[in-house]
Amino acid sequence: MTTATATRVRILRAAERLLGRDPDCALAQVAAAAGVARRTVYGHFGGRDGLVRGLVEEAAEAVRHALSGPGAPVPGDDPATALARFVRTLWPVGDRYGTLIALARRRGLGPDPVHAVLGPARDTVAAIVARGQRTGTFHTVVPAGVLGAALEAHLLTLLTGARAGTWEDDGRGAAVAALVVAGVEAGRAERIVGRGAEEGVGALWGR
């Protein structure tokens, strides 16, 4: 890693930490936390909007990486297992992109940065939900697109609660909740998620 790259990463980590707590914190504070001069932050990112875009790009890459990793949904999964895998896989990076979506919207950066982060996740959920409704695994009270949007909003709310410290979860509780929202009976949802926890390496959670 070059010195410039290492400096950029250090600035991003400081910004992620500080902006996540206070979206209005000064760039001078970010610079101080990263151990660089304020002009160095401007040199790398051009200003606050550029810094937020840098964070969003990094989060988008983390989401893409998670969705292509060993714990991600695979074609052979039944819809309920696929949705559980999806939630559990994204939970570790979800806290990051939830904060950044809020920042991007607050900065008025438009829909593109938000879609960069959520686009791959939305596409995955849309396919899972459509298949789940076709097979009778998920309810059909609302159209697939509406159910997918409801699941997204539900999970972002759970992530907000986790960031605020109102509850703690490693993604398993969130996976159960998502399955229930989709129409899976609570006891079955718990068994699906619990099975993944019990099977260990190579199982539902891809560990």
For the regions a language model picked out, list residue spans one by one.
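Basic, helix-initiating cap at the start of DNA-binding domains
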Residues: 1-33, 49-53
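Short hydrophobic/aromatic patch on the recognition helix
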Residues: 35-45
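Amphipathic alpha-helical packing segments from all-alpha helical-bundle domains
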Residues: 64, 110-160
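Short linear capping/connector segments at secondary-structure termini
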Residues: 69, 102-111, 194-195
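Helical hydrophobic small-molecule/effector-binding pocket
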Residues: 77-105, 115-130, 184-188
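C-terminal peripheral helix-coil segments that are non-catalytic and often amphipathic
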Residues: 127-134, 160, 164-207
